[in-house]
Curated annotation (Swiss-Prot):
InterPro entries: Ac/propionate_kinase, Aliphatic_acid_kin_short-chain, Aliphatic_acid_kinase_CS, ATPase_NBD. Its EC number is 2.7.2.1. The gene is ackA. This is Acetate kinase. It comes from the Bacteria. It comes from Rickettsia prowazekii (strain Madrid E). Belongs to the acetokinase family.
Length: 385
């Protein structure tokens, strides 16, 4: 039998499962890429991008996804599952490194659900189901906030009374698993050393940027929740708190309505009135869609300026995640607005998504490095085995 580990990443309507082979106590190839999603009243089940089945929803969708996976898994007699790894978005102030799952840990993490209502409930539901079904093996949690535990108190604090900081109301930062992968695998991907002062732009449906100093997180654009920072697909990013007070007092909106607005109806979707998909907006002739793209770029450029100030300089800019690693248009727009830094982009290399897209004469190196959060979780899981 072949030893494997399973990496799970759950959303509100989808479940991604990666299965990695283990050889000589090292992570080897990914042998299965499994994706289950809720689509209208059906659950679609894909294995290595090929549709396996379509099932009508008759119960809790996430539970059904796990059950469908389990039915398939029972047929994989040649594979021996030795551990699972799970991405959990928010670790709060108490979890700053990967941990082994137990009931106490799950209970503590449930308290953090209000800080990440789009992700945490589903992350924990899947974790709990695997924990109950596969009790004989280890289950390891990796947190998106852990990478930022090297941030100093001054970068974490809000200008609120200290009692709130003591309660955990502070800046945490997110997308840490992505930043950890890009920074730790940078040399093997680009064949260059990671410079001392780097900024990584994780641009996807959720977007953030991180200042990396000597391989460690110095500060990042996201704060207490995944709403903060640059504008995203459906989230507004940095927002004056007075706007929320106005919506409550003058628009008479409820907390649930505001939550829906900020998490699901703002950002590129809200600004364009057309789509949250960057490819659709770039191709659109709509004035509002063009404005949404321009605002997305503008907010990123402003954030890069803040991070340069925190780093006291910049040696390189790295693009990653769905938009960052696949959209030459967005990379070019951002780079042009940073031309005052001496950034020069090679047009052909940028169009081909090559790893280094800056010219030899560029004062700041610019890279495209695909992220791999599943692999970094798998590598962390192996440290426990």
């Amino acid at each position: 039998m072949k030893d494997v580990i399973l990496i799970a990443n759950a959303g509100s309507s989808s479940l991604k499962i990666s299965i990695f082979a283990i050889q000589n106590k090292r992570v080897n190839d990914k042998i299965y890429n499994i994706f289950l999603e809720k689509n209208n009243n059906k659950i679609l089940f894909y294995i290595n991008q090929q549709k396996e089945s379509t099932t009508s929803i008759k119960d809790d969708p996430i539970e059904m996804m796990i059950n469908l996976f389990e039915e398939w898994w029972k047929k994989q007699s040649a594979l021996n599952l030795i551990a699972t790894g799970h991405r959990i978005v928010h670790g709060g102030k108490n979890f700053n490194k990967p941990v082994v799952v137990n009931k106490k840990v799950i209970k503590e993490l449930r308290v953090l659900i209000p800080l990440s209502p789009l992700h945490q409930p589903y992350n924990l539901q899947v974790l709990d189901l695997f924990f109950q079904k596969y009790k004989a093996i280890s289950h390891i949690i990796c947190f998106d906030t852990s990478f930022h535990c090297t941030n100093s108190p001054i970068t974490k604090a809000f200008g609120l009374p200290k009692q709130y900081y003591d309660k955990g109301i502070m800046r945490y930062g997110f997308h840490g698993l992505s930043y950890q992968y890009v920074s730790s695998h940078f040399k093997e991907i680009t064949m260059e050393d990671l410079p001392p002062k780097a900024i990584i732009a994780h641009l996807g449906s959720g977007s953030s940027l991180c200042a990396i100093k000597n391989g460690l997180s110095l500060t990042s654009s996201m704060g207490f929740s995944v709403l903060d920072g640059v504008m995203m697909a459906t989230r507004p990013g940095n927002l004056d708190p007075g706007v929320v007070l106005y919506l409550i007092n003058n628009e008479k909106m409820t907390i649930n309505e505001i939550t829906e607005l900020l998490y699901k109806k703002s950002g590129l979707l809200g600004m364009s009135g057309e789509s949250s998909d960057m490819r659709t907006l770039i191709a659109s002739n709509s004035h509002d869609s063009k404005f949404a793209v321009d605002l997305f770029v503008y907010r990123i450029v402003l954030e890069i300026g803040k991070l340069i100030a925190a780093l006291e300089g910049i040696d390189c800019l790295i693009f990653t995640a769905g938009v960052g690693q696949n959209s030459p248009v967005i990379r070019e727009m951002i780079s042009k607005k940073l031309s005052w830094l001496g950034i020069k982009i090679d047009y052909e290399k940028n169009q081909k998504n090559e790893h280094r897209i800056s010219t030899k004469g560029s004062k700041i190196k610019v890279f495209v490095v695909p992220t791999n959060e599943e692999l970094i979780i798998a590598e962390e899981v192996m440290k426990f085995l």
